[in-house]
């Protein structure tokens, strides 16, 4: 269990807000390779914000690849006026790579879930990449990515060494997204 509302021992600079929820902008102390995790999140109600400004955050797997968190409930063509990443930027999208198969967002202030299965990239003894990382994501119980093969780079970021394990990072994007019931099982 990484977070059950009682303490932030598993997190770097983790903070509990409203007496029971984990605040955005923290990462796990432990680093992970192959794993499965579950988390619940809640986006704020921001009725005057447009597009990606509505409850924007993200969950970074291995501190590299971002699973988008945003209030995309009711997302429609109107949102494309405000965002260049309007497809990828929906909740559950893999940032700048692929949008979710279906928009499974609940309204803001509702608790939502991500259940994620992640398989790290594989390398031979010489350090040559043999197989890319792969991810499966369920948003609110519905599969939105099925064994998606992740490219060898993280869009918009400096090159990374995929051989390293990494933390789970809950992005600080200056929006008050909160989390609860976070657990992870290494595989």
Predicted regions and their residues:
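Carbohydrate-interacting regions of secretory-pathway proteins
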Residues: 1-187
């Amino acid at each position: 269990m990484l977070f059950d509302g009682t303490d932030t021992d598993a997190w770097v600079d983790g903070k509990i807000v409203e007496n029971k929820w984990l605040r955005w902008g923290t990462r796990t102390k432990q680093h992970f390779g192959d794993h499965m995790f579950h988390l619940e999140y809640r986006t704020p109600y921001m009725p005057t914000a447009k597009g990606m400004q509505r409850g924007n955050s993200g969950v970074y797997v291995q501190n590299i690849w971002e699973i988008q968190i945003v209030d995309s409930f009711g997302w429609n063509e109107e949102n494309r006026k405000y965002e260049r990443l309007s497809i990828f930027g929906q909740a559950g999208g893999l940032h700048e790579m692929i949008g979710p198969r279906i928009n499974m967002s609940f309204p803001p202030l509702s608790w939502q879930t991500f259940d994620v299965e992640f398989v790290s990239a594989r390398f031979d003894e010489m350090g040559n990449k043999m197989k890319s990382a792969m991810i499966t994501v369920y948003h609110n119980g519905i599969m939105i990515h099925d064994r998606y093969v992740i490219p060898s780079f993280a869009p918009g970021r400096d090159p990374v060494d995929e051989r390293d394990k990494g933390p789970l990072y809950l992005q600080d994007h200056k929006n008050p997204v909160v989390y609860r019931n976070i657990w992870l099982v290494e595989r």
